[in-house]
Amino acid sequence: MIKAVVINASPRKSGNSSHISEYIMERLEGKAEVTYYVLREMEFTGCIDCGYCQRNRGCVIRDDLHDMYRVFDESDITITITPIYFDGTPWKLKAMIDRMQAIYNSKYVLEDSLIDRSKPRSGFVVCHGGAPEYETQFEGNRNVLQFMYRSINTE
């Protein structure tokens, strides 16, 4: 059975991201072993730039994201559902992504990756916004999420 990570990045309970997440979770039932992150319900901090991950594998912070590195390493697919705020990501998603600095440093500074770089992984992002559509509406979010997905070797 495949392993999936589903991230609901909305700070709003019962909003669009929740409905989309529920739909996706129903479709994955019985087809995937799912780790479901509802970021608004989790207690964690962003990167504090302490430098620990530049000298050691992993992150010194022990909170609800502590197992994130293992979960992403074991995953076959990652699905992120997020609203757009001022062309960007909600703060908790950005804080989670900033904590992936430990993965980046393990790969490129320590050359001892926390993520199996040979394992193929798939990723999907569902973004939605309330503003009238305009050409660059999703670019800020796309840029940040591209870095996140690259850090976990996901296309």
How would you name each of these model-derived features?
Residues 109-152:
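Short, glycine-/small-residue-rich phosphate/pyrophosphate-handling segment
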Residues 1-105, 110:
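N-terminal beta1-alpha1-beta2 submodule of the flavodoxin-like/Rossmannoid cofactor-binding fold
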